Amino acid sequence: MERQPKSLSDAVQLLQTTEIISKCTQTIIAEWSNEAETFKKRASSGRAGAELVLPSHELFNAQRTITAAIGKLIELVSEPSVRILEIAGQYQESRALYIAVERRIPDILASQDNEGGMPVKELSSRTGIEYRKLSRILRYLCSMGTFRQVGPDVFANNTISACLVANEPLRAYVRLTGSEAFTASDRLPKTLLDPSTGPSYDVTRTAWQDAIGTTKPRWEWIEERVEPDKLLDSGYHYPGIPSLILEPQPPGEDGLVARPELEIMGLAMVGGGRVFGAAHVFDFPWASLDNALVVDVGGGVGGFALQLSKVYPDLRFVIQDRGPVIQQALESVWPNENPAALKDQRVQFMEHSFFDKNPVEGADVYYLRYVLHDWSDDYCVNILSHIRESMAPHSRLLICEQVMNTTIGDPDLTSAPAPLPANYGFHARFSHSRDLTMMAAINGIERTPEEFKTILKSAGLALKQIWECRSQVSLLEAVRADARTA
């Protein structure tokens, strides 16, 4: 295949892109310096603030812009056929990370002097993976900048892998995406072409069901108790959680075990929420709401309410979800994370299906985080309609979701500077990856502003504002349509 010559337009874009990188680099270095001073002041005062968990607005904008520019740079300078092969093999990046996280390699490396690193043979004995194979996996991760090689077959954490040390919620997120979600994605090409599942948006007719070998919705399946040998051999495509090979779960008195995916899911929602959810704590004016009642609909174990409760001590919460999830929140999450809120009765827990009218009427805020992306449009209109029935004229609905931009831009969203893709391209990779994960697992959808407006209007609601936060996830504020026009 003959190479194609680059054009003058390519050269102009290359110069523009490198100029953007240069400007962003200066901003980032300046903001790093400001952060160092701020951290010193906070450490001496003992007070926590947004700057301890979030980059400044200037730093965030520079980070996403330079990441988008790096993607544009790769597009411009790569040999096209080489780039195609790179993309084709990128699934191995996530597999390598999943293997390392499953076997707790960041924690093992942190258990001794990180500067000196750990020989791969010692890592092998502690992980159960043959040392030469493990070395190849870690070399791959080091090449990606996820770990650090300090000598021949000697490895250590770097700043990226170190964020996984003693971080069970973030580890759970990697385990979630690397287990059942990955297996579902493997079946997606087949189910897209199937005349039954291809056009369907039913939550029981997805690539996930094809991979698992069940007709149940995912939420029912992960709540099952089964025979221990079923955890690693479902008889279908899904191999289960690998660590169970070396660390099997003991059965209960009934001879059954809980699926580990339920606990992983609960922790993963906390972990993912901490990564992208910190901005929602500080980039929305919660302080102005005083002692408002916030109903977290489908709130899981209450991961976001945990974050809010520690920063805004006057807010009150009702957390609603399925029974087993609420039980997990009451028994193992809140007693450890915020026992004071339980004692002071600032938080209540309620078993509730969001396909029924919300039993809490007239709350100040109804909060939907990562719920609507689980469902196709008809389901979403049903969910939203039942919330609207319970809303008072003063009530507001906050929807915490990815708001999808495209490479050509959207008038409701901020665009990246030219010649970068309007949606910040490389920076938005995770958003688009999660969109396809939703498609494969539950026929869910990550929506554009217009798609959100459509389902809100159908439910008798109106979009008031999109709060673009220091995150890939935004807040959409909606009110009753009749309240907006009153």
Curated annotation (Swiss-Prot):
Protein EC: 2.1.1.283
Keyword S-adenosyl-L-methionine: yes
UniProt GO BP: methylation; secondary metabolite biosynthetic process
Positions that bind S-adenosyl-L-methionine: 298-299, 321, 353-354, 369
Catalytic activity annotation: emodin + S-adenosyl-L-methionine = questin + S-adenosyl-L-homocysteine + H(+)
Entry's pH dependence statement: Optimum pH is 7.0-8.0.
Record-linked InterPro entries: COMT-like, O_MeTrfase_dom, Plant_O-MeTrfase_dimerisation, SAM-dependent_MTases_sf, WH-like_DNA-bd_sf, WH_DNA-bd_sf
Keywords: Methyltransferase, S-adenosyl-L-methionine, Transferase
Pathway the protein acts in: Secondary metabolite biosynthesis
First-tier enzyme category under EC: transferase
Practical uses of the protein: Geodin shows the glucose uptake stimulator activity towards rat adipocytes. Geodin also enhances the fibrinolytic activity of vascular endothelial cells.
One MF term in the entry's GO annotations: O-methyltransferase activity
Active site (UniProt): 373
Stored PANTHER family: O-METHYLTRANSFERASE CICE (PTHR43712:SF2), PUTATIVE (AFU_ORTHOLOGUE AFUA_4G14580)-RELATED (PTHR43712)
Function noted in UniProt: O-methyltransferase; part of the gene cluster that mediates the biosynthesis of geodin, an intermediate in the biosynthesis of other natural products. The pathway begins with the synthesis of atrochrysone thioester by the polyketide synthase (PKS) gedC. The atrochrysone carboxyl ACP thioesterase gedB then breaks the thioester bond and releases the atrochrysone carboxylic acid from gedC. The atrochrysone carboxylic acid is then converted to atrochrysone which is further transformed into emodinanthrone.
Similarity remark: Belongs to the class I-like SAM-binding methyltransferase superfamily. Cation-independent O-methyltransferase family.
This protein's name: O-methyltransferase gedA
Gene: gedA
